[in-house]
Amino acid sequence: MSTILKSLPKGENVGIAFSGGLDTSAALLWMKQKGARVFAYTANLGQPDEADYDEIPRKALEFGAEKARLVDCRTQLVHEGIAAIQSGAFHVSTGGIAYFNTTPLGRAVTGTMLVSAMKEDGVNIWGDGSTYKGNDIERFYRYGLLTNPELRIYKPWLDQQFIDELGGRAEMSAFMTAHGFAYKMSAEKAYSTDSNILGATHEAKDLEHLDSGIKIVNPIMGVPFWRDDCAVKAEKVSVRFEEGQPVALNGQTFTDPVALFLEANTIGGRHGLGMSDQIENRIIEAKSRGIYEAPAMALLHIAYERLVTGIHNEDTIEQYRISGMRLGRLLYQGRWFDSQALMLRETAQRWVARAITGEVTLELRRGNDYSILNTESPNLTYAPERLSMEKVEDAAFTPGDRIGQLTMRNLDISDTRRKLNLYTQTGLLSAEQGSHIPRLDNDKS
């Protein structure tokens, strides 16, 4: 049996993820008038651009909802954000600057917590505003059915009758006004924005064109650090972790992780830390472009990785990075709670994060420009005396030890020389005239 409904199920309970914006307001009123019993659910994700969360359910009731609930998702979202930092679950980056998967993390929490609330109310049909070209339609589909296997999906934006009657924002605004709800369309921005406490995503419209850059974006979590008239002063910041958990900023201890994230957002946001411009592959393999903000995630990630490199050995760090790339893709695809993701995540949290105790001090400047000033941890395996260029007592190894180690390298050096000679004989390599360095025959550089 198909779980996707192509037309409105009249007379049935239908839940809608309600944002209070024009689209979901018009959809709620339209579904009510067409005979559905509409239940509205709003996720409080700590969106930085939302002024009054309590007003949103009240609006839903005015528009005809049978019931309207505000579901506080902030603690769970911050918990998942910290888990992503602990496991390095970030696979998209440009020039070493990462996208922190803040929207995929938000969808994982929204999709599970709202559907759980619907299930409590006897609502087994869910609608949201995701379009068929994006990632969210699949993320919400997966998380919804994981939470409630009896769930069916109804999306007004996939219903041809809804599209014919209310196909655009102008039609929606006129529809609301005609039914006694004065609803002015907000000024049209050059891009769309989606946000939560972990970060903000700016995409679509003008940002679909690669010759429109970050300068057209008005940050909602930071400052336009690229502007000459934007004053940004250098700031010294300390971040402390205990067994992988961020616990203190600038010496202030936080027992509430949400409060810590809000403060980290404020600190990082003063500098525009964590803003990035990324080209990525959507789930359906088409490329899209987004400009992202994530000041707290960036600040915590920098400090966490500094401790990782000072505490763990090379092979552990390699596995952490490789597994993190894979886990980041799974998160992006809406598979954050799949078994293969849980396996990678739990491994990093247990064997990497548990050792991460210490404090990192940074100097933040403009954007992603920063310096690390100090790194302290009782678990550091960094020991400068081991490699000191000065004469030290009780050295970890002697010149004679190194001679023996280098002599052992003769084995693999000899093997490598034989392979290079073999490749030259078969024509795979050729010696550059006047040089003893072999080159690939097809290397025209």
Swiss-Prot record:
Chain sites annotated for binding ATP: A17, F18, S19, G20, G21, L22, D23, T24, S25, A43, G129, T131, D136, D194
Presence of keyword Transcription: no
Location of the protein in the cell: Cytoplasm
A Pfam family this chain is assigned to: Arginosuc_syn_C
EC code: 6.3.4.5
Top-rank taxon, per record: Bacteria
Reaction(s) catalysed by this chain's protein: L-citrulline + L-aspartate + ATP = 2-(N(omega)-L-arginino)succinate + AMP + diphosphate + H(+)
Record: residues binding L-citrulline: Y99, N135, R139, S192, T201, E203, E280
Enzyme superclass (EC): ligase
GO CC term, one of those recorded: cytoplasm
InterPro entries: Arg_succ_synth_type2_subfam, Arginosuc_syn_C, Arginosuc_syn_N, Arginosuc_synth, Arginosuc_synth_CS, Arginosuc_synth_type_1_subfam, AS_cat/multimer_dom_body, AS_multimer_C_tail
Entry keywords, A to Z: Amino-acid biosynthesis, Arginine biosynthesis, ATP-binding, Cytoplasm, Ligase, Nucleotide-binding
Pathway linked to the protein: Amino-acid biosynthesis; L-arginine biosynthesis; L-arginine from L-ornithine and carbamoyl phosphate: step 2/3
List of residues binding L-aspartate: T131, N135, D136
Molecular functions per Gene Ontology: argininosuccinate synthase activity; ATP binding; protein homodimerization activity
Gene Ontology BP annotations: argininosuccinate metabolic process; L-arginine biosynthetic process; urea cycle
Self-association and partners: Homotetramer.
Family designation: Belongs to the argininosuccinate synthase family. Type 2 subfamily.
Protein name per the record: Argininosuccinate synthase
Name of the encoding gene: argG
